[in-house]
Amino acid sequence: MAETEEEEDSEAWLRLKPVEPLPSQCCGSGCSPCVFDLYYRDLERWETARARNDRSLLSGKQPPESQSCSAKLSPETFLAFHISTMEKVTKDTYLVRFTLPGNSRLGLRPGQHLILRGVVDGLEIQRAYTPISPVTAEGYFDVLIKCYRTGLMSQYVESWRTGDTAFWRGPFGSFLYEPKKYGELLMLAAGTGLAPMVPILQSITDDEDDETFVTLVGCFKTFEGIYLKTFFQEQARFWNVQTFFVLSQEVSPEQLPWSYRDKTHFGRLGQELVAELVACCRRKPFTLVCGSPAFNEDMARCLLSAGLTEDSYFLF
């Protein structure tokens, strides 16, 4: 009889043992804590509780689904947020607005990002996204999400409908913009790599005391693929902001509106153009880079060749 009770107790403990995450559950963005950090923390807690035969030591663990959006944003726990609107801004990209309770703020600083959790065919996946809404936005936050034909997270996002719930945790990010710290910022972004630049840029132009010069360069395939055109047109009206675009699949300025012809380069952003951008800055710029791993690597190499040092740029 005692042996049966011992076996049942052992099985009960095994059911409580944390499950090691799959590789797909790691977003690959170097977040801290990572899903694997959380797993090892919970595993250590479980091992201690089992050794002491004290299940109360597991009380710190809460399933992500148990937290509603009324709770405080946490890097460790996923919170539920409702989708209020979902706008298709290009053929493969959505601007999604999530509701915050009352007039509360999300609590991110410019440059920080969140982790989205999705489940497709029973497989859990996680990806990093940067909200593009102002950090002062009340009652909502906006996220720009590009969908890929074979992407698992893309399948999950394209299944969303207004009123659905999505789970986020955060904030994360080792770059935190500090007003007036840099005399000049050079922003190099490819595609949705614009996302972390948007709240940083807006925080500068919203602050009358922050006179940081900003040169933003957005890289896209076509003019139609440029995100947030209206926003960047408005930002370019500020005395301390310049915006440029690099289009890899356009060949003639005649196909562009007049307002874009003088600030658009055709081809790819390479060594020569990066050197020219750095040289045109009023002072040595601090450079922010965000795009694919290959884009980031190329830009780092170009910046070093242009005379910048490794401590004068940041790769998102």
UniProtKB/Swiss-Prot annotation:
InterPro entries: CBR-like, Cbr1-like_FAD-bd_dom, FAD-bd_FR_type, Flavoprot_Pyr_Nucl_cyt_Rdtase, FNR_nucleotide-bd, Oxidoreductase-like_N, OxRdtase_FAD/NAD-bd, Riboflavin_synthase-like_b-brl. It holds the Pfam family Oxidored-like. Its EC number is 1.6.2.2. It is an enzyme of class 1 (oxidoreductase). FAD binds at residues 158-173, 183-215. Belongs to the flavoprotein pyridine nucleotide cytochrome reductase family. NADH-cytochrome b5 reductases are involved in desaturation and elongation of fatty acids, cholesterol biosynthesis, drug metabolism, and, in erythrocyte, methemoglobin reduction. This is NADH-cytochrome b5 reductase-like. The gene is Cyb5rl.
